[in-house]
Amino acid sequence: MERRASETPEDGDPEEDTATALQRLVELTTSRVTPVRSLRDQYHLIRKLGSGSYGRVLLAQPHQGGPAVALKLLRRDLVLRSTFLREFCVGRCVSAHPGLLQTLAGPLQTPRYFAFAQEYAPCGDLSGMLQERGLPELLVKRVVAQLAGALDFLHSRGLVHADVKPDNVLVFDPVCSRVALGDLGLTRPEGSPTPAPPVPLPTAPPELCLLLPPDTLPLRPAVDSWGLGVLLFCAATACFPWDVALAPNPEFEAFAGWVTTKPQPPQPPPPWDQFAPPALALLQGLLDLDPETRSPPLAVLDFLGDDWGLQGNREGPGVLGSAVSYEDREEGGSSLEEWTDEGDDSKSGGRTGTDGGAP
């Protein structure tokens, strides 16, 4: 798969901040969007990988050859052109990092959709691997180490992902030798005004959950640290630690009460008691209630050599039978032989695998 040199916000004027550089890149890219009558002019459309409120993702084979790609479609009646271009440009700028899903050249527009291609992850997303129990400790460490590097790469370029969750982690092989963070639809320059989530989310940090409209907070990398901590918990347990990081949620209150009590009780509340002390220390740092003292993502690297206490999770070469590929998931149900670019998305459910959420 062709990879070009990354375009970073540092390119050009060294004094230009990330937000200004990104806006400049969006403006330059506007003229590079290719209008086509149909996506079939350039791709053989194989099957639907997922869908969401703003579009869908299709498995497609370029007519010009090369590997299959995940073709992301965003509905033009629901997504601003600038929103589409921003996601595409951010993706192109950070594609050099293996922990971030590669966005390919050549943005398109049809009468109904904006579209761009991304690399295809054969094993789907991380949420599909998490069934009744969490991953083996080795795989949990592989996942969070790769994501920590990806987030540090974003943060070093003045960007915050702002949507770290299992659904947005794409898996390339059953043992997680490579995973990549996708869905850059909510990625913004650090300092961008950020409101509370439109609906309660288990991955949102308490400082955002506490906001009331129309209040906002400047977007900070600490938001991604919190998301990484929640994702670590999910990968280890196959469930979220709470429905929302806000009182009166009982699970969050139990955790918050434990970490804020001085001196801290030696025994954490369930389900945190399943983690060994090094993993607890890592989780407490990433899930620090104060964003000013929250650990950066790369703190993960200091704990990789420690025992995390996850020996009870599935072990052995056959433990990931649930890590089915997109082909296995879609078998017999999502042929695109009859689909057209004017297809009706209103009946689609689920998520897109790389869907950007609200514009």
From Swiss-Prot:
Region feature (Disordered): 314-359
Catalytic residue positions: 163 (proton acceptor)
Keyword Transferase (UniProt): yes
Domain of life where this protein originates: Eukaryota
Enzyme class of the recorded protein, top EC level: transferase
Protein kinase domain span: 43-309
Listed InterPro entries: Kinase-like_dom_sf (IPR011009), Prot_kinase_dom (IPR000719), Protein_kinase_ATP_BS (IPR017441), Ser/Thr_kinase_AS (IPR008271)
Pfam family name, one: Pkinase
Entry's EC annotation: 2.7.11.1
Name the record gives this protein: Uncharacterized serine/threonine-protein kinase SBK3
